[in-house]
Amino acid sequence: RCLPESLDPKTEQNIKWSAKLGSDTHSTPVIAGGRVYIGTNNRVPRDPRQAGDRGVLMCFAEETGEFLWQLVVPKITTSRFWDWPNMGICSPVTVEGERVYVVSNRGEVMCLDPAGLRNGNQGPFVDEARHQTPAGEEPIPVGERDADILWLFDMIGQLGVRQHDSAYASILVDGPFLYVNTSNGLDDKHKTIEAPDAPSLIVLERATGRLVATDGERIGPRIFHCTWSSPARAEFGGQPTIVFAGGDGVVYGFEPLKAVPPAGEVVRLRKLWQFDCDPEAPKENVQSYVGNREVSPSNIKGVPVIHGGRVH
């Protein structure tokens, strides 16, 4: 679309605007509704009150590069293997209408207002000041350049997920539902799965953040490293399918939810099929093979891509 043949960041040749991020940026920029969203770290704080390591999601104006607002999330302090130093927020956002969905560095599925707090605190979540401040410190008051959290779902606190290194998920929107991989993975020593019963794939009600379904496959004990592969939606022979690659090297096909379950009910996703991408690999005590360069299980970290009726 009329892209230049070349560009030079040093001389700013063919560069419309640039914006300073942190020192490490693992997220993918997403452009929607005239805004640019990208996760980074806090090595170069935009808010002098927010000193130190944090996860950050920044929002800029697409046309001018003006900084609009940021989500600042304190680090998990349990150990570095929960929330690796200076990783920032690694997950890309998903934008649907006037809602922005993202998974924070603390394993929280968040719904944000794309306008930030410039148009007021919309709620129902209204404790942004406490949320953006490390535990034990006086809450940092919020302003117009801070994020407006509408709701959040804490996968660690509410599901017992043990994320590894960092949370990563590209949230899939399907009708009234959000499909999210949980980043459940290994312990600090890369030897065991601390949360074997925690789900690998969950479904939330998009409007409220309520948990409505889980994969129910108990993938946990078979996870070789972590659950970083995000779900995708496809249709095979007229059958809608949620395609999900587990941390056990198996690709699963689930039937999408058709209706929101009654209040308080969490259902199990119906599995349509599964395919083991490495059937000859070890299947028992898989974590004992970590570091083995000759024989080991496999896991999948990329998002499934569907084309021509095939999953890649």
Description of each model-found segment:
Residues 1-312:
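Noncatalytic, solvent-exposed loop/strand surfaces
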